[in-house]
């Protein structure tokens, strides 16, 4: 913290301020409880299987996982990680699934039941293809997910050059309206095609589908998306799940996270990750900024200084 002169400096002042603030409010922040309604399913078996038998030298399991998580982060959606052996799928309204290449029938049936009961799934390509032993299923893909997904496929291909989607169906602009790396030749049964390839051969099959199954929906990505396209798909899924709101309307540099304190009060953390001032309209119940001790009312304009934060505790 101190430089070679051992004198207080800018960094020392920052650390001092942080320590003072933590001393003042820290006891009310410990044991923070999160109630996220979005989960990301992480499969270490799928990670290793795809590493062992890669489908591309540019994209792998981690690439898609990071893309999906990054999109949710930019959308200000709080995310939990769940795993194939997790038993709490019903705690969530939306589960996002990177390529679930390795999965037993029981897991895929649990995901289908999650949708049937009113949950929403966003599932990446190659999911449901192999069983728990990384052996390709002797059935049409995506195996036990077929009914919930509303389609099947028997063929797939590598795409060496990006392909555009026909007609910019998600309204993201020409630069981001393209896919690459992988294409599954999806044959819809009950699923709706959200987007098709703009190509004389691949255009026969949808790139993105959505199926209503029971009380929920399953959105499927049969190809590798651009970051903006992934973000738009996940924003649509948040809307379907009833989870989109004012947090998704904040400026790109403002992040917000929520929790419940050990005193049972709702906390809202707003962080400005930019060198310019940011102003937003506070949408939650009236409270107090724990750092400035100023009252903050619902619908009040709140200003964040560069690289600053507001920590609002509801009354």
Residue ranges with predicted function:
Residues 1-315:
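Carbohydrate-binding surfaces of carbohydrate-active enzymes
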């Amino acid at each position: 913290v101190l430089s070679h002169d051992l004198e207080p400096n800018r960094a020392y002042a920052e650390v001092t301020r942080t320590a003072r603030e933590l001393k003042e409010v820290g006891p009310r922040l410990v044991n923070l409880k999160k109630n996220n309604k979005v989960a990301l399913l992480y499969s270490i078996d799928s990670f290793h299987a795809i590493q062992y038998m890669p489908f591309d030298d540019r994209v792998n399991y981690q690439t898609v996982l990071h893309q999906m998580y990054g999109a949710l982060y930019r959308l200000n959606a709080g995310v939990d990680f769940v795993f194939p052996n997790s038993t709490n799928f019903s705690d969530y309204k939306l589960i996002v699934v990177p390529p679930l290449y390795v999965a037993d029938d029981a897991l895929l049936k649990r995901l289908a039941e999650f949708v049937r009961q009113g949950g929403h799934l966003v599932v990446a390509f190659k999911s449901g293809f192999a069983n728990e032993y990384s052996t390709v299923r002797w059935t049409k893909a995506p195996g036990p997910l077929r009914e919930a997904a509303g389609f099947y496929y028997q063929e797939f291909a590598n795409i060496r050059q990006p392909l555009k989607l026909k007609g910019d169906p998600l309204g993201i602009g020409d630069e981001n309206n393209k896919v690459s790396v992988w294409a599954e030749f999806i044959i819809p049964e009950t699923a709706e095609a959200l987007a098709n390839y703009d190509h004389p051969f691949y255009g026969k099959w949808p790139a993105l589908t959505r199926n209503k199954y029971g009380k929920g929906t399953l959105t499927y990505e049969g190809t590798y998306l651009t970051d903006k396209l992934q973000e738009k798909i996940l924003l649509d899924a948040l809307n379907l799940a009833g989870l989109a709101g004012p947090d998704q309307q904040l400026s790109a540099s403002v992040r917000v996270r929520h929790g419940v304190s050990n005193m049972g009060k709702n906390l809202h953390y707003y962080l400005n990750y930019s060198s310019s001032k940011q102003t937003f309209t506070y949408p939650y119940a009236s409270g107090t900024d724990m750092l400035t001790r100023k009252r903050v009312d619902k619908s009040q304009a709140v200003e964040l200084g560069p690289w600053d934060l507001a920590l609002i505790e509801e009354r």
